[in-house]
Design a protein with these regions (language model features):
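Juxtamembrane regions of bacterial inner-membrane/periplasmic proteins
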Residues: 2-279
Length: 279
């Protein structure tokens, strides 16, 4: 190689980090702007006096017909059940639960299939609100970065309010208000502790697991997961004893007093049945 060619090669090599940085910024900056725009407008706009949720981005901009329920009208039992069922360390992590990610990898690697999901409520919120449904490493990277940024920007209570207003509880059933009307023929504010736990049970796979709520024939896994969520609520101290008793006594099937689990056992219990795919 001539000295001139060698010099050109070294010059290009020196420019490579700058080119990679430019590519990263071209991907990162628009995504961050989109995220923060979404945070600014997440308080729902009201075209007709009723609050609606607008999907900010994605393959198709869509107006979901989910009535917005303010935090003051969401029963504490619903918040407790969702946190216990979806993200037990929600109030401890900063958007991404790295311990849960590590454990999910270990459990799934050992099982040879997706058995345990690792996404936090914040990650699910970013994924469901700002990202397309297409799975890719780029989408996962944006989900992780978005969750970290969202947690820096928004309080935990606001995240929960947003999540409960946009999460899917069944086919075209978005938000806690629609779920309450669809499954229990009442408004979200009137949900009992038992009904809140039942809704939390189906969240990982609402389009499949909602059959138990629709038919009122509760599958064995539905009953086991109900007991697990009640157990986690008790361990985490998310509800008063009186509401915990109601969650057990009002259940549509027998719910005994489950033994207390240690922290490692609690994390290990966050698995899906064999035929389901981790989040």
């Amino acid at each position: 190689m001539s000295s001139a060619s060698s010099e050109r090669f070294r010059r290009r090599l020196r420019l490579l980090p700058l080119a990679l940085l430019a590519l990263f910024l071209a991907w990162f900056v628009p995504w961050v702007l989109t995220l923060y725009l979404g945070v600014l407008v997440y308080f729902p706009y009201k075209p007709d006096g009723k609050s609606r949720y607008v999907r900010v981005t994605g393959p198709v901009a869509a107006l979901f017909g989910a009535d917005w329920t303010p935090r003051s009208e969401i029963p504490k039992a619903c918040v407790a059940a969702v946190v216990a069922g979806e993200d037990a360390r929600f109030f401890e992590h900063r958007g991404v639960d790295w311990e849960s990610v590590r454990l999910s990898y270990r459990v799934n690697e050992k099982a040879g299939r997706p058995k345990r999901g690792g996404s936090t409520i914040t990650q699910q919120l970013v994924k469901n609100t700002f990202l397309s449904r297409k799975r890719s490493y780029v989408r996962k990277a944006r989900e992780l970065v978005g969750a970290l940024l969202l947690d820096l920007t928004m309080s935990k209570e606001s995240q929960l309010t947003w999540y409960l207003n946009v999460v899917e509880f069944g086919p075209n059933v978005y938000g806690i208000e629609r779920a309450a009307q669809y499954y229990f023929k009442k408004g979200a504010a009137k949900l009992t502790p038992s009904e809140c736990v039942q809704l939390a049970v189906i969240l990982p796979r609402p389009n499949r697991w909602n059959r138990s709520l629709v038919t009122r024939r509760y599958a064995p896994f539905f009953q086991r997961r109900y007991r697990t969520i009640c157990n986690r609520i008790r361990i985490l101290g998310l509800l008063e004893d009186a509401d915990m008793r109601l969650a057990r006594t009002q259940a549509p099937f027998p719910v005994g007093e489950a033994p207390l689990l240690s922290a490692p056992q609690l994390r290990e219990s966050e698995t899906l049945p064999p035929h389901e795919e981790g989040r």
